[in-house]
From Swiss-Prot:
One of its GO terms (cellular component) is Holliday junction resolvase complex. The lineage of its organism: Bacteria, Pseudomonadati, Pseudomonadota, Alphaproteobacteria, Rickettsiales. Belongs to the RuvC family. It comes from the Bacteria. It catalyses: Endonucleolytic cleavage at a junction such as a reciprocal single-stranded crossover between two homologous DNA duplexes (Holliday junction). Mg(2+) 1 binds at D7, H142. Keywords: Cytoplasm, DNA damage, DNA recombination, DNA repair, DNA-binding, Endonuclease, Hydrolase, Magnesium, Metal-binding, Nuclease. It comes from Anaplasma marginale (strain Florida). The gene is ruvC. Binds 2 Mg(2+) ion per subunit. Its EC number is 3.1.21.10. The keyword DNA damage applies. Mg(2+) 2 binds at E68. The RuvA-RuvB-RuvC complex processes Holliday junction (HJ) DNA during genetic recombination and DNA repair. Endonuclease that resolves HJ intermediates. Cleaves cruciform DNA by making single-stranded nicks across the HJ at symmetrical positions within the homologous arms, yielding a 5'-phosphate and a 3'-hydroxyl group; requires a central core of homology in the junction. The consensus cleavage sequence is 5'-(A/T)TT(C/G)-3'. Cleavage occurs on the 3'-side of the TT dinucleotide at the point of strand exchange. This is Crossover junction endodeoxyribonuclease RuvC. One of its GO terms (biological process) is DNA repair.
């Protein structure tokens, strides 16, 4: 099964594609960040996220997608921007007929590190450790969070399948 994880953001949207087999192994196929820095109009940023994700989706036979849920923080403007980026990401995935699953950042962190309050550095460390990614391979926080979302979905899917047997 091939899963794309998405960490939405208006300036930086992270993505990571993992492959999971029945033998319980998971490997990272690719990851990256869609940057909209230098684009001033919000509508153009959203379009770039949408088109860029479509491009990534066309490279792989994605079975399912996992995306981080939006949380509302104390800054309404940044929360709205995050919602827009998430919508652009969701529409890209849904337009390809791919089922999308949503997880809160707390649920993803708990699944990956054991603590829903884990700092980004701990999430990144556990993502690298789980997938055997060497320290000299550069993966920024946005990609790491997206890969964590994909891993969270893999682990949750396995637990559901195990419970059904």
């Amino acid at each position: 099964m091939m899963i794309i994880g998405i960490d939405p953001g208006l300036e930086f949207t992270g993505w990571g594609v993992v492959s999971s087999t029945n033998s319980q192994s998971v490997c990272l196929l690719d990851s990256g960040v869609i940057s909209t820095r230098g684009i001033s109009r919000e509508s153009e940023k959203l379009y770039k996220i949408y088109v860029s994700l479509l491009s990534v989706l066309s490279l792989y036979k994605i079975d399912e997608a996992s995306i981080e849920k939006v949380f509302i923080n104390s800054n309404p403007r940044s929360s709205m921007s995050l919602c827009y980026a998430r919508a652009a990401s969701t529409i890209s995935v849904m337009s390809r007929g791919i089922d999308i699953y949503e997880y809160s950042s707390t649920a993803i962190k708990k699944c990956i590190t054991g603590s829903g309050m884990a700092p980004k550095e701990q999430v990144s460390f556990m993502v690298r450790s789980s997938l055997g990614i060497k320290q000299d391979v550069e993966i920024n926080n946005h990609s790491s969070d997206a890969i964590a979302a994909a891993l969270c979905h893999v682990y949750n899917t396995r637990n559901r399948n195990f419970a059904l047997k």
